């Protein structure tokens, strides 16, 4: 009988072989160059807090606690993503941030190398996950993931969301698109996993193909907020929209201030024992007597759709 890892590597080789094709516009290296008149791009800023922020435990790079994120620019598309490492692995001596961080860094590298199709964000997630499965030294862990791709020329946003991270698209002060949260049961989101052989059949593991995928047109000035559940569990839509009203233009500095304001407010609410958070409301709906915010890692990527410039 194959172990989980042995079987995973065989699947990874087969999948990677089938994903070798790329969009012709995405070939030939990353970075800028060749933007056509009328192309769209994303101006993106991020902010976040690790759950242990009060203890001064911050990680290097684009990681906030067990969360990770990336923002990558290619001539054919702007791509960004967030991932939330499953903290339960810490009980088994595994650093949950290693899985989520490596997953996001692999996604970023694929985009910069042009090894992706803008209309297929699930493909980015699948190829990245398969590369993790192929590691000679197993990288154990689990993570949710959300990938957002703006195709410059078609002005379409393509998304893939697995688990309870997610995105909002705001236009004219209203949410016009949003991701669907995926849960097996309360507080147990869909997740990508790599488990040791002895844990076969015990650790939850979903396929990248299980990600909820959407595609839709966007307009200049649309606001896209991509975040881990640490935000959405602590701030309802109306609070997020109130903060977004402060965003008056597409200057990076303005976006950065707003992203920080949103992340800071979510972080403060997470430690308020009297606050009826979205997470507490969801818990009550599931028969649990819970009140207060949910202390968690928080990652926020805030983007505005603008005219593309190299």
Swiss-Prot record:
Phenotype of gene-disrupted mutants: Global knockout of Pptc7 causes perinatal lethality with decreased mitochondrial content and metabolic abnormalities. Pptc7 knockout animals exhibit increased expression of the mitophagy receptors BNIP3 and NIX, excessive mitophagy, and decreased steady state levels of mitochondrial proteins.
Record's catalysed reaction(s): O-phospho-L-seryl-[protein] + H2O = L-seryl-[protein] + phosphate; O-phospho-L-threonyl-[protein] + H2O = L-threonyl-[protein] + phosphate
Entry EC number(s): 3.1.3.16
Domain PPM-type phosphatase: 75-305
Residues given in the record as Mn(2+) 1 binding sites: 84-85
Quaternary structure note: Interacts with FBXL4, BNIP3 and NIX; these interactions are important for ubiquitination and degradation of BNIP3 and NIX.
Any Gene Ontology biological process: negative regulation of mitophagy
Keyword match Cell division: no
GO CC annotation, single: mitochondrion
Gene3D superfamilies: PPM-type phosphatase domain
Cofactor(s) the protein needs: Mg(2+); Mn(2+)
Organism: Mus musculus (Mouse)
Its job: Protein phosphatase that plays an essential role in mitochondrial metabolism and biogenesis. Positively regulates biosynthesis of the ubiquinone, coenzyme Q. Dephosphorylates the ubiquinone biosynthesis protein COQ7 which is likely to lead to its activation. Serves as a crucial sensor for mitophagy, though the underlying mechanism remains ambiguous. May dephosphorylate BNIP3 and NIX and thereby directly regulates mitophagy receptor function and stability.
Protein name: Protein phosphatase PTC7 homolog
Keywords, ordered alphabetically: Hydrolase, Magnesium, Manganese, Metal-binding, Mitochondrion, Protein phosphatase, Transit peptide
Molecular function GO terms recorded: metal ion binding; protein serine/threonine phosphatase activity; protein-macromolecule adaptor activity
Protein's UniProt keywords contain Disulfide bond: no
Annotated residues for binding of Mn(2+) 2: 84, 229
Name of the gene this protein is made from: Pptc7
Stored PANTHER family: PROTEIN PHOSPHATASE 2C, PROTEIN PHOSPHATASE PTC7 HOMOLOG
């Amino acid at each position: 009988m194959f172990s989980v890892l042995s079987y995973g590597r065989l699947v990874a080789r087969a999948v990677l072989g089938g994903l070798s094709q790329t969009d012709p516009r995405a070939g030939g290296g990353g970075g800028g160059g060749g933007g056509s008149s009328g192309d769209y791009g994303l101006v993106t800023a991020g902010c976040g807090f690790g759950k242990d922020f009060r203890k001064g435990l911050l990680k290097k790079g684009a990681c906030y606690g067990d969360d990770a994120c990336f923002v990558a620019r290619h001539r054919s598309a702007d791509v960004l993503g967030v991932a939330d490492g499953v903290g339960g692995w810490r009980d088994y001596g595994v650093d949950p941030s290693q899985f989520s961080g490596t997953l996001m860094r692999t996604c970023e590298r694929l985009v910069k190398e042009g090894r992706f199709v803008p209309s297929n964000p699930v493909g980015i997630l699948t190829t990245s996950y398969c590369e993790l499965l192929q590691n000679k030294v197993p990288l154990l862990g689990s993570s949710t993931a959300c990938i957002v791709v703006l195709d410059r020329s078609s002005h379409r946003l393509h998304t893939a969301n697995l688990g309870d991270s997610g995105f909002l698209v705001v236009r004219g002060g209203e949410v016009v698109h949003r991701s669907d949260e995926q849960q097996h049961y309360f507080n147990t989101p869909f997740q990508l996993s790599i488990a040791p052989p002895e844990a076969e059949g015990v650790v939850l593991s979903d396929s990248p193909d299980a990600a909820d995928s959407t595609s839709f047109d966007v307009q200049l000035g649309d606001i896209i907020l991509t975040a881990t559940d640490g935000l959405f569990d602590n701030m309802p839509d109306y609070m997020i929209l109130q903060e977004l009203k402060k965003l008056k233009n597409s200057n990076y500095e303005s976006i950065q201030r707003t992203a920080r304001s949103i992340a800071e407010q979510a972080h403060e609410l997470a430690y308020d024992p009297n606050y009826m958070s979205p997470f507490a409301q969801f818990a009550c709906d599931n028969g649990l007597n819970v009140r207060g915010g949910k202390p968690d890692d928080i990652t926020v990527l805030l983007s505005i759709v603008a005219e593309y410039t190299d």
